[in-house]
Amino acid sequence: MGWGGGGGCTPRPPIHQQPPERRVVTVVFLGLLLDLLAFTLLLPLLPGLLESHGRAHDPLYGSWQGGVDWFATAIGMPVEKRYNSVLFGGLIGSAFSVLQFLCAPLTGATSDCLGRRPVMLLCLMGVATSYAVWATSRSFAAFLASRLIGGISKGNVSLSTAIVADLGSPLARSQGMAVIGVAFSLGFTLGPMLGASLPLEMAPWFALLFAASDLLFIFCFLPETLPLEKRAPSIALGFRDAADLLSPLALLRFSAVARGQDPPSGDRLSSLRRLGLVYFLYLFLFSGLEYTLSFLTHQRFQFSSLQQGKMFFLIGLTMATIQGAYARRIHPGGEVAAVKRALLLLVPAFLLIGWGRSLPVLGLGLLLYSFAAAVVVPCLSSVVAGYGSPGQKGTVMGTLRSLGALARAAGPLVAASVYWLAGAQACFTTWSGLFLLPFFLLQKLSYPAQTLKAE
């Protein structure tokens, strides 16, 4: 199979017709699931992994500890080493997402010109390399290096949404985005449980196995979904617009889309920008609390890695159930209303998690949290996928994913800092109230007719 051809593992002439939509969705689902299984193995292990580097007196980790302790003393705070790992986790998560933020729009713009398949394969090679670096070394520096390489290469997620956005019918796009949500749910169900059951030294090797399998699977079975006649004229045009793709203000204004060929009309562009702001605010708030959740349960309830894995398993199982029974059945045009309901549920969800001192209260909060997490991103992605001409789909979805990466870059660091400074209750209470901001923005959304049709 050549880099730009259709399915199968042997060379053949390029395919000029659109591949079957069901096949594309299935390949995207399975490939993304393998990627997420590798990624989520780490989630229940992170608190213990960071603490193990501290106990091993790793020189780089020790220098981080010393710097944070010095800063705490300088501002008159008591030195609380047990909260330092929360801050470090936020820093690592933010660094990973900063690199996603920088690379995702460039990945999308490049795929608009070269096609989805070759760029996807390059991203997956980088992801596999990141796990190989982690697997072959036990130092904190090597772990950080693997996270940085992974962040640079993580454009495969935005490419998955761009591939679904290439599909011809609004119903196929809507169902495809829901299936991507199912892949996330299953990945966050099975991956953490598997990671928690593995010895710490085996986890990176299993992640590498999943990543290598994903690369081989996509190489053999992913067809090209962007025909030559619908591609952008040149990569140079995309790189020339790098400022639009990397500037936070330009991203929020979708400037790369507005200045491209065949941009959306004025009303639709205004709606697209508001949807982008909602997406950014939601993920900024959600990712911050999501990243601190495992540290809260580790410190308040003394959850072990196995218990963390069980928690993420139940979260993922709930999300997968909601995705299959509810989210994928939302009809085109009903996504915004579903998102508003989910945002309102997050207010009591995070209040219960932040203040709960018993496992039943925590469980109720996690149930509401899981419902919202299963709905918001797939529904917003489905709506946004209806904007832009066929040659702009990669740029539209790459810009959206860059907004998400920017939110995930800032969210964990800000939430972890508030957690470190003021504690879990103050952090979760403040963030739960802030979820009303994206809700009110959607209340005022001008939702043009025919949104789900391709431009």
From Swiss-Prot:
Disulfide bonds: none annotated. It is a multi-pass membrane protein. Keywords: Apoptosis, Cell membrane, Membrane, Nucleus, Transmembrane, Transmembrane helix, Transport. One of its GO terms (biological process) is sodium-independent organic anion transport. This is Major facilitator superfamily domain-containing protein 10. Belongs to the major facilitator superfamily. Probable organic anion transporter which may serve as a transporter for some non-steroidal anti-inflammatory drugs (NSAIDs) as well as other organic anions across the luminal membranes of renal proximal tubules at the final excretion step into the urine. Gene3D superfamilies: MFS general substrate transporter like domains. It is found in: Nucleus inner membrane; Cell membrane. Its main location: nucleus. Signal peptide: none annotated. GO terms for cellular component: brush border membrane; cytoplasmic vesicle membrane; membrane; nuclear inner membrane. The chain crosses the membrane at residues 27-47, 86-106, 113-135, 148-168, 176-196, 202-222, 275-295, 310-327, 336-356, 359-379, 421-441. Pfam families: MFS_1 (PF07690). GO terms for molecular function: organic anion transmembrane transporter activity; tetracycline transmembrane transporter activity. Expressed in luminal membrane of renal tubules (at protein level). Detected in all tissues tested with higher expression in heart, splee, kidney, leukocytes and prostate. It comes from the Eukaryota.
